[in-house]
C-alpha cells in the first residue's frame, strides 16, 4: 500500500451511510468501484490484517486515495456503482464488454411492407421484432420467412424501380407487389400472418391458413388451395423443429459456469415460449474474484446498459443464487420502471431450459480452458527457443496486401497469452508510394504504428514481419529509430515463406542479428507463429478487398459531376452493377430514379469517353 495513503485517518472520516466508493492508484486512475449499505463497515474490511483474498491484497497495495459518494439507499448505490463502472472501466472490477447493438427484423410501414434486417436506432416507421442474439440469427430467420411468406425483402428504391418481377418472384419467395402481381388485400393478409409468426403465434397462423385453404377448396380455387396447403405444411415442419414451452411469456434463462478465472454466462432468450436465440458472454474477471461478485456484476451491467437497445423481459431465471439477488431485483426494477424478477429455484419447462443453458455454459468454459492451455504451452516453448528471460505478454505481426499495387493495405494483429486480441487489431491504408513497392508499404505501416510510442505504451515483446530479409531490415531500421530513447524495444522476427509456400517450411530471421533458423513442422511454437502470421494475412486481405471494392464501385461514377452517393447507389441498384451502368444506353439510364435526360447523357459520355 502506498505510504501516502493513511487508511486509519481516512476511515475516521467515513460515515455508516449507504454509498459508492472509488479507489484510485498513484496515476489517479480509478482501479476499483464498489458500493455498500454501510460504507464504514465495508471499507474497514479492506484494511484488516491477514487478508485472505489475493485479489483484495493486490487491490489494496495499489490504493493511493479513495473518494466516497453517499446515496439515499442501497438501490441508489447499486445504480450509481453501475454508472461509475461503465465510465471508468476499472481493472479490478468484473467488466462486461457488450457494446454492440442488437439486430432486429423490421416490418416496415409501407403500402407493401418489407421485411428487413435492422441494427441501430429505430428511426424508420414500422414494427421491430427482436432483439436477436446476433446477425446470423436474423439472416437465418429472414431466409426462413422468404420460404413461408411471399413478402418482399428488397429496399424501397429497388422496389420503385422495378418494371418486371425479379428472380425472387420466379422462386416463389415474393409475390411481386411492385408490378401488381398480387392484390393489396392478399398481400396484407400475408403481412398479418408474418407478423403473427414473428410474435411466436404459429398455431394461430396455421389455423388461419387452414380456414383459407378450405374456403378456396369450396370455391373450387384448387390452385390457390394447394398454395395454402404447402404453406401450412412448411409452417408445421418449422413448428415441430422449435423447442416450445407451455409458458407463453418472455424470459431470459441464464446458465453460469465459473472455473479457473473464466466465467461464461450462456443466455437463452425465451420469447412467447420459444427459444428465440442464445448467446454466450465472457466478462473480464480479475483473478480470485468470488462467484457472488461475478454474478452481481453481470446482472447489473447486462440489464442496466442503456447504450444497448435490448428488450428486457419481466422474468430472469439464473442457475446460481447469490447474496444481493433481491437488492438487484429492486435496483433493475426501479431503473427500468417495470416489474423485474430473478428466479433460481424453478421447475418444469423453466428447469429444462436452465439445464440446457448450464450445459452450454460449462462446455464453453471447458473449450476456452483447453484453448487457453494450448496457447500457453506454445508461448512457453517459443520463449525457450528464443531464450527469453521474461515471459512474452504481447506479440504483433505485420502484413501487406494489394492487387498489382492497387488499394494497398497493411495489417497489424495482436496476440496475448490467451490468443488473438481482436480489439487491438489495426489496418493502415497505404498512400503516396509507388504501386507494388512492398518495402515502402512496410516502412509506412511500421512508422505509423510506432510514431507516438513512449515508455509505458503498448509495446510488443515480439514483432513478426510477414516477409523476407528486405522487409525485415526496413522494419528493424524504423524500430531502431523510434525506440532510440526508450529502454525497451520489440524483438523483430521475419517469417519468410518456404518452398512452394508450404506450411512448416518457413524460415525465421532475427531482426537484430539477421540470423536465420527453422523449426520442425510439428513444433507447437511454429504453430503459434503460423497462427499469428495467417491471422495477419487474413486481416490484411479482408481490408484490401474492402478498399478495392469501394474504390472500384465509387471512383468511376463519383468522379462524374452531379453524381453523389445517392445517385451512385440508385444507378448500381437499378441496373445491377458498375459494368451494367457502363453498358447502358441513355434511354436506359433515364429510367433510373433521380436521373434526368441531361444527367443520363453526361454519365453516358463520361463512361464511354
UniProtKB/Swiss-Prot annotation:
Its main location: cytoplasm. GO terms for cellular component: cytoplasm; excinuclease repair complex. InterPro entries: GIY-YIG_endonuc, GIY-YIG_endonuc_sf, GIY-YIG_UvrC_Cho, Hlx-hairpin-Hlx_DNA-bd_motif, RuvA_2-like, UVR_dom, UVR_dom_sf, UvrABC_protein_C. Residues 203-238 form the UVR domain. Keywords: Cytoplasm, DNA damage, DNA excision, DNA repair, Excision nuclease, SOS response. PROSITE patterns: GIY_YIG, UVR, UVRC. It is found in: Cytoplasm. Pfam families: GIY-YIG, HHH_5, UVR, UvrC_RNaseH, UvrC_RNaseH_dom. Residues 16-94 form the GIY-YIG domain. One of its GO terms (biological process) is SOS response. The keyword Transferase does not apply. GO terms for molecular function: DNA binding; excinuclease ABC activity. The UvrABC repair system catalyzes the recognition and processing of DNA lesions. UvrC both incises the 5' and 3' sides of the lesion. The N-terminal half is responsible for the 3' incision and the C-terminal half is responsible for the 5' incision. Belongs to the UvrC family. Interacts with UvrB in an incision complex. This is UvrABC system protein C.
Amino acid at each position: 500500500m502506498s505510504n501516502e495513503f493513511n487508511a486509519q485517518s481516512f476511515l475516521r472520516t467515513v460515515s455508516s451511510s449507504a454509498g459508492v466508493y472509488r479507489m484510485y492508484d498513484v496515476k489517479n486512475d480509478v482501479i476499483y468501484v464498489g458500493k455498500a449499505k454501510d460504507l464504514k463497515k465495508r471499507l474497514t474490511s479492506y484494511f484488516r490484517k491477514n487478508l485472505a483474498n489475493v485479489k483484495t491484497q493486490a487491490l489494496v497495495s495499489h490504493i493511493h486515495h479513495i473518494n466516497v459518494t453517499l446515496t439515499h439507499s442501497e438501490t441508489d448505490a447499486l445504480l450509481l456503482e453501475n454508472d461509475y463502472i461503465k465510465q471508468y472501466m476499472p481493472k479490478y472490477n468484473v467488466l462486461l464488454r457488450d457494446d454492440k447493438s442488437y439486430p432486429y427484423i423490421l416490418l416496415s410501414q409501407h403500402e407493401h411492407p418489407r421485411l428487413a434486417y435492422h441494427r441501430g436506432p429505430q428511426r424508420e416507421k414500422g414494427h421491430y421484432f427482436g432483439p436477436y442474439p446476433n446477425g446470423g440469427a436474423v439472416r437465418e430467420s429472414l431466409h426462413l420467412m422468404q420460404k413461408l411468406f411471399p413478402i418482399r425483402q428488397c429496399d424501397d428504391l429497388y422496389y420503385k424501380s422495378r418494371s418486371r418481377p425479379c428472380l425472387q418472384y420466379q422462386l416463389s419467395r415474393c409475390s411481386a407487389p411492385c408490378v401488381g402481381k398480387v392484390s393489396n388485400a392478399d398481400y396484407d393478409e400475408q403481412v398479418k400472418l408474418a407478423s403473427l409468426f414473428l410474435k411466436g403465434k404459429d398455431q394461430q397462423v396455421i389455423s388461419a391458413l387452414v380456414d383459407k385453404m378450405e374456403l378456396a377448396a369450396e370455391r373450387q380455387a384448387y390452385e390457390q388451395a394447394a398454395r395454402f396447403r404447402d404453406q401450412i405444411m412448411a409452417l408445421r415442419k418449422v413448428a415441430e423443429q422449435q423447442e416450445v414451452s407451455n409458458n407463453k411469456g418472455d424470459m431470459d434463462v441464464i446458465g453460469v459456469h465459473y472455473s479457473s478465472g473464466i466465467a461464461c454466462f450462456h443466455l437463452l432468450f425465451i420469447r412467447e415460449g420459444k427459444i428465440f436465440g442464445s448467446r454466450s458472454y465472457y466478462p473480464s474477471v480479475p483473478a480470485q474474484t468470488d462467484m457472488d461478485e461475478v454474478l452481481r456484476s453481470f446482472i447489473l451491467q447486462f440489464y442496466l446498459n442503456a447504450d444497448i437497445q435490448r428488450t428486457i423481459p419481466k422474468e430472469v431465471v439464473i442457475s446460481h443464487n447469490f447474496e444481493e439477488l433481491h437488492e438487484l431485483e429492486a435496483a433493475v426494477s426501479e431503473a427500468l420502471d417495470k416489474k423485474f424478477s430473478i428466479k433460481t429455484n424453478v421447475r418444469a419447462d423453466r428447469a429444462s431450459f436452465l439445464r440446457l443453458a448450464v450445459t452450454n455454459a460449462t462446455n464453453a468454459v471447458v473449450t476456452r480452458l483447453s484453448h487457453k492451455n494450448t496457447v500457453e504451452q506454445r508461448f512457453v516453448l517459443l520463449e525457450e527457443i528464443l531464450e527469453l528471460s521474461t515471459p512474452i505478454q504481447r506479440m504483433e505481426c505485420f502484413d501487406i496486401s494489394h492487387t498489382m499495387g492497387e488499394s494497398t493495405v497493411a495489417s497489424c494483429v495482436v496476440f496475448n497469452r490467451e490468443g488473438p486480441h481482436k480489439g487491438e487489431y489495426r489496418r493502415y491504408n497505404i498512400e503516396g508510394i509507388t504501386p507494388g513497392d512492398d518495402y515502402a508499404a512496410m516502412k509506412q505501416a511500421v512508422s505509423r504504428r510506432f510514431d507516438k510510442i513512449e515508455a509505458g505504451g503498448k509495446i510488443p515483446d515480439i514483432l513478426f514481419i510477414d516477409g523476407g530479409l528486405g522487409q525485415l531490415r526496413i522494419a528493424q531500421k524504423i524500430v531502431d529509430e523510434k525506440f532510440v530513447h526508450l529502454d525497451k524495444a520489440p524483438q523483430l522476427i521475419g517469417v519468410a515463406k518456404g518452398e512452394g509456400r508450404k506450411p512448416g517450411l518457413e524460415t525465421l530471421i532475427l531482426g537484430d542479428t539477421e540470423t536465420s533458423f527453422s523449426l520442425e513442422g510439428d513444433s507447437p511454437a511454429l504453430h503459434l507463429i503460423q497462427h499469428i502470421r495467417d491471422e495477419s494475412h487474413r486481416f490484411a486481405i479482408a481490408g484490401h478487398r474492402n478498399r478495392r471494392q469501394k474504390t472500384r464501385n465509387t471512383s468511376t461514377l463519383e468522379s462524374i459531376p452531379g453524381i453523389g452517393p445517392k445517385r451512385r447507389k440508385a444507378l448500381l441498384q437499378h441496373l445491377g452493377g458498375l459494368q451494367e451502368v457502363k453498358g447502358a444506353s441513355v434511354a436506359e439510364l433515364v429510367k433510373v430514379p433521380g436521373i434526368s435526360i441531361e444527367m443520363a447523357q453526361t454519365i453516358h459520355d463520361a463512361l464511354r469517353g
